[in-house]
Regions:
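Short secondary-structure boundary/capping segments
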Residues: 1, 105-106, 123
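Walker A (P-loop) phosphate-binding motif
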Residues: 2-38
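Active-site proximal helix/loop that lines the substrate pocket
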Residues: 16, 41, 123
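Active-site phosphate/pyrophosphate-handling residues
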Residues: 21, 71-72, 119
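ATP-dependent small-molecule kinase phosphotransfer cores
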Residues: 38, 42-113
Length: 123
């Protein structure tokens, strides 16, 4: 995929396959690297996402300090396929939008290549 003269490369693979090492090598050579897992972690703390998670799963998923209670969300979702599907329906659009925004910013900043490190790129 190209965006305004910027080549976008997707990097996927299992845990321990060397994605982080390869990402660092690309970054050392001037590529902008986007870590989809990191984007997801950051995005899950946005107020709009938190509000949507409360609507989907109740206030149980929010800590008293208004941050995401990741442990409780995991307990709710990771043993129930329907709830996991619902979690993905809620957060996926926000994550994709944030990744697209970061790609656009990198392209506008003159990046010739963006490496998207996304372990679940094909799901």
């Amino acid at each position: 995929m190209k965006r305004q003269g910027t080549v976008i490369v997707g990097l996927t693979g299992q845990t321990g396959a060397g994605k982080s090492t390869l990402s660092r090598m690309f970054a050392d050579r001037g590529a902008a690297v986007i870590d989809a897992d990191q984007v997801a972690r950051e995005t899950m703390e946005h107020k709009l996402v938190l509000a949507d998670l409360v609507l989907a799963f109740s206030t149980e998923v929010i800590n008293p300090d208004a941050t995401l209670n990741r442990k409780r969300l995991a307990q709710i979702c990771f043993g129930d396929r329907q709830k996991l599907r619902r979690l993905n329906e809620v957060v996926y659009p926000y994550i994709v939008r944030e990744i697209e925004d970061r790609i656009d910013r990198a392209a506008k900043a003159g990046a010739r290549m963006v490496l998207l490190d996304a372990p679940t790129l094909y799901e």
